[in-house]
Amino acid sequence: MRLILLSSLLLLGIFLADGDEVDPDGKVLNSLIYGVMHLQREFANLKGAFLTVHRARSFGSGSERLYVTNKEIKNFEALRQICEQAEGHIPSPQLENQNKAFANVLERHGKEAYLVVGDSANFTNWAAGEPNKAAGTCVKADTHGSWHSASCDDNLLVVCEFYFIL
């Protein structure tokens, strides 16, 4: 939005710097003002539509985070790159409802996927006997949402996490 306003001011500055009789009737200025107001309304409409879709997508899971798969099967490093390119994150459920939303994706596809567990995690969902460093340094979730130690070379379902701070 700021970019639009700055662009409008730049255009006005170009007109003013021309040296000729500039906009004696105020038509250019009024046109710019109208254009900015129109863009502000469009932006508000798009923001509202986006929030509606986001709320609808997250309604069923009770989570404000979205877990989305591209259905590819990749190792941890490839997952990291894919999620980064998509401007998402490797899943890192911080609450039970987030883990459930993540597990729902895995259950629908009948596959396991990687996740990241932070050092200061208040929520964990380790399966019995886990974590087991002998199994690997990465973490995967099964179709029930239970966490297991895993090799980072395993090829698992690609799932990225997206969350919105508004």
UniProtKB/Swiss-Prot annotation:
Disulfide bonds join C83-C160, C138-C152. InterPro entries: C-type_lectin-like, C-type_lectin-like/link_sf, C-type_lectin_CS, CTDL_fold. One of its GO terms (molecular function) is carbohydrate binding. Keywords: Calcium, Disulfide bond, Glycoprotein, Lectin, Phospholipase A2 inhibitor, Secreted, Signal. PROSITE patterns: C_TYPE_LECTIN_1 (PS00615), C_TYPE_LECTIN_2 (PS50041). SUPFAM superfamilies: C-type lectin-like. Glycans are attached at N122. Residues 46-161 form the C-type lectin domain. One of its GO terms (cellular component) is extracellular region. Gene3D superfamilies: Mannose-Binding Protein A, subunit A. Residues 1-19 form the signal peptide. It is found in: Secreted. It comes from the Eukaryota. Expressed by the liver. Belongs to the alpha-type phospholipase A2 inhibitor family. This phospholipase A2 inhibitor binds directly phospholipase A2 in the presence or absence of calcium. Homotrimer; non-covalently linked. This is Phospholipase A2 inhibitor clone 05. It comes from Bothrops moojeni.
